[in-house]
């Protein structure tokens, strides 16, 4: 009986850890699949608002764009108009952000950019140097005049066990990015 009392706290921590980590991995898998589907949609000439509507309609737990998630569509283009300020530069050509969670894209520009409806294209894409990206992941090369379609999804992960009370931290925001 004494041995059981000694081992029980450790056993509880292990069981709660397995349950919580499994739950977080399942949620991350859902976020990753949703992100890939978003990039797949926008790479096939679906408008950004239509793609956002599709992802909103197909999302379920843990993703709820009205309360605890954020979706960011970005289209990267290499400037192809010779003689312009953005010729040969990777620029943020289109962007649509949707959702209630306060999160920002890993793709940042050098300055201010405006992306208005209905197509959410950048204003003055050939001449606005503020659209130039600060850096792309190593190995990502955008051909001249080509585009790369990027989807990012952030969602808040809710714990289902008191696992964090034992000093073990599980991420509270899950994130996925897909480049097509």
Enumerate the language-model features and the residues they cover.
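Soluble periplasmic/extracytoplasmic beta-strand elements of cell-envelope proteins
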Residues: 70-75, 150-152, 177
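Amphipathic, coiled-coil-like alpha-helical scaffolding segments used for oligomerization/assembly
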Residues: 61-63
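Alpha-helical assembly-interface signal, strongest on the long, hydrophobic N-terminal helix that forms
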Residues: 1-59, 69-78
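Short secondary-structure subsegments characteristic of cysteine-rich extracellular domains
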Residues: 170-180
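Intrinsically disordered, low-complexity regions enriched in Pro/Ser/Thr/Gly and acidic residues
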Residues: 79-172
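Short, structured loop/turn "capping" segments at alpha-beta junctions
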Residues: 65-69, 83-85
